[in-house]
């Protein structure tokens, strides 16, 4: 029941509705929780040690001279945002295996520190004992830039003679473009509205900014050129085409270059309205700032924190954010989620055996079936065509929403019902 996110009260309700006697009192339930915590921690630590060894083995296939210098991504997740969260979980995941190498579960009533400060402390701790715990150094850190985690790691100087290098999560770098454009639109009048910086246009520019980085993450110059190509592309018109920086050839994403390669420029017409000059002038500094070499150098390699975020979601499925909880429950959820994340549902059978529970053939068949389905979903997510399809469907939804907002009066928004 704990794995299902159901606690003592839920267990009592289930027994009552199923006409079963309540076979546990509160104190016995607490004792059992401690046993589950101890066993889940033991199993999780075994799997994390295995993951570290797999990550080191994967390092032997690279040109890195020291297999003990690992590249990892780190992220933190908290039961509640801001100053009210008492519990949080931070994770470190290996770049090559995509498996969790370490987790740190924090318990603090945030009267003085925000969740961000707890994340910094948790990450610094995991870096500080990586050598004694695993015999490795986290030499390259993939972070989101949303907190002061990296500066905290640098200040703590965990490895003395080894500097920890920062790599940016491309997903979070991409979000900066959307955030900057929305802030600009909000602060500067006249940039929004039809034919200008609508929500759809901002989303498009943000997505293409991210794609420019992802598709050219092996070169700073190529990234910078690709980013500025998207800027000039959306400022082009039939009268003033400006596609010199767009990739050439029939395979180009730029319809103008595609038409030129096929010798069809005489009949070509832009299928979109160019951004007005005042909008282009306003957003150009943002493009220049977000294509600076210092930032793009940290994007070399095309890293992300997607695995950390998937782990975060798994933790709160086991320990829902909507339900009051305790430190023990959060710990159990984190360790169990870590086991499932690294080894699949089969890891739960290992945990049950550690608790002294016998697993029958139905349990094994269920674990095999669920793990097979999990692998199928993972393969589907990794498919580039599927990802492009999701982006296309998202833009179609934005089109529908904008059409509805244009054609109807505003029915929902801040201040709409102030007259009542």
Please give the residue ranges for each predicted region:
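Extended, non-catalytic structural segments that build the interaction scaffolds
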Residues: 1, 284-300
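Active-site rim beta-loop-alpha module in soluble metabolic enzymes
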Residues: 280
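RNase H-like nuclease fold core
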Residues: 1-13, 17-140, 147-273, 285, ...
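Alpha-helical transmembrane segments that form the membrane-embedded catalytic/substrate-binding core
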Residues: 143, 147, 172, 306-313
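General secondary-structure edge motif
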Residues: 9, 110, 291-295, 314
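Amphipathic alpha-helical/coiled-coil segments positioned at domain termini
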Residues: 294-392, 396
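Short amphipathic alpha-helical segments, especially helix-boundary/capping motifs
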Residues: 125-129, 286-292, 308-313
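Amphipathic, non-membrane alpha-helical segments in soluble helical-bundle scaffolds
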Residues: 1, 276, 301-305
């Amino acid at each position: 029941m704990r794995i299902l996110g159901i606690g003592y009260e839920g267990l009592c309700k289930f027994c009552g509705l199923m006409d079963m006697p309540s076979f546990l009192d509160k104190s016995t339930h607490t004792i059992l929780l401690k046993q589950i915590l101890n066993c889940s921690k033991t199993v999780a630590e075994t799997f994390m040690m295995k993951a570290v060894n797999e990550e080191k083995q994967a390092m032997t296939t690279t040109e890195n001279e020291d297999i003990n210098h690992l590249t990892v991504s780190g992220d933190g997740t908290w039961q509640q945002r801001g100053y009210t969260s008492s519990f949080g979980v931070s994770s470190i995941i290996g770049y090559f295996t995509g498996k969790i190498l370490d987790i740190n579960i924090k318990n603090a009533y945030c009267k003085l520190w925000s969740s961000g400060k707890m994340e910094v402390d948790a990450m610094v701790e995991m870096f500080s004992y990586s050598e004694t715990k695993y015999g490795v150094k986290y030499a390259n850190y993939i972070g989101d830039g949303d907190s002061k985690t990296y500066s905290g790691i640098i200040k703590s100087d965990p490895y003395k003679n080894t500097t920890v290098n920062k790599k940016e999560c491309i997903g979070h770098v991409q979000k900066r473009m959307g955030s900057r454009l929305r802030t600009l639109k909000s602060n500067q009048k006249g940039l929004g509205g039809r034919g200008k910086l609508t929500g759809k246009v901002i989303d498009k520019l943000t997505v293409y900014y991210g794609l420019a980085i992802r598709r050219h993450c092996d070169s700073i110059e190529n990234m910078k050129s690709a980013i500025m190509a998207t800027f000039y592309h959306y400022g082009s018109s039939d009268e003033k085409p400006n596609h010199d920086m767009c990739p050439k050839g029939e395979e180009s994403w730029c319809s103008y270059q595609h038409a030129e390669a096929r010798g069809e420029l005489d009949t070509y017409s832009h299928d979109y309205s160019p951004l007005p000059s005042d909008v282009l002038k306003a957003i150009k500094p943002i493009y220049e700032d977000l294509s600076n070499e210092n930032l793009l150098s940290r994007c070399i390699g095309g890293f992300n924190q997607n695995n950390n975020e998937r782990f975060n979601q798994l933790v709160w499925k086991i320990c829902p954010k909507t339900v009051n909880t305790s430190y023990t429950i959060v710990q159990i959820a984190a360790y169990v989620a870590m086991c499932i994340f690294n080894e699949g549902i089969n890891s739960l059978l290992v945990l049950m055996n550690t608790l002294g529970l016998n697993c029958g053939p139905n349990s094994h068949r269920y674990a095999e079936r669920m793990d097979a389905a999990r692998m199928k979903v993972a393969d589907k997510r990794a498919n580039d065509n599927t990802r492009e399809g999701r982006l296309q469907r998202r833009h179609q939804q934005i089109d529908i929403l904008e059409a509805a907002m244009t054609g109807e009066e505003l029915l929902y928004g801040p201040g709409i019902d102030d007259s009542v």
